[in-house]
UniProtKB/Swiss-Prot annotation:
Protein name: Large ribosomal subunit protein uL30
Protein's UniProt keywords contain Ribosomal protein: yes
UniProt organism field: Levilactobacillus brevis (strain ATCC 367 / BCRC 12310 / CIP 105137 / JCM 1170 / LMG 11437 / NCIMB 947 / NCTC 947) (Lactobacillus brevis)
MF GO annotations: structural constituent of ribosome
InterPro entries on file: Ribo_uL30_ferredoxin-like_sf (IPR036919), Ribosomal_uL30_bac-type (IPR005996), Ribosomal_uL30_ferredoxin-like (IPR016082)
Lineage: Bacteria, Bacillati, Bacillota, Bacilli, Lactobacillales
Pfam families: Ribosomal_L30 (PF00327)
Assembly with partners or alone: Part of the 50S ribosomal subunit.
Keyword tags: Ribonucleoprotein, Ribosomal protein
Length: 60
């Protein structure tokens, strides 16, 4: 299964509480921090809601 490399580009400060919780749940801490997440529907749904804050790359 493919993995997604998620990088936080913009700060989650001054965002809606739901968006801050999603950033925290994905394991992103600071700007420019990256995590690997599985490529599934649940992850893609979370990424869609904070798409304006992140950059996503597919990793094999």
């Amino acid at each position: 299964m493919a993995q997604l490399k998620v990088t936080l580009i913009h700060s989650a400060a001054h965002r809606l509480p739901k968006q801050r919780k999603i950033v925290e749940a994905l394991g992103l801490k600071r700007v420019n921090s990256s995590v690997l997440q599985p490529d599934n529907e649940a992850t893609r749904g979370a990424l869609f809601q904070i798409a304006h804050l992140i950059k996503v790359e597919e990793v094999k």
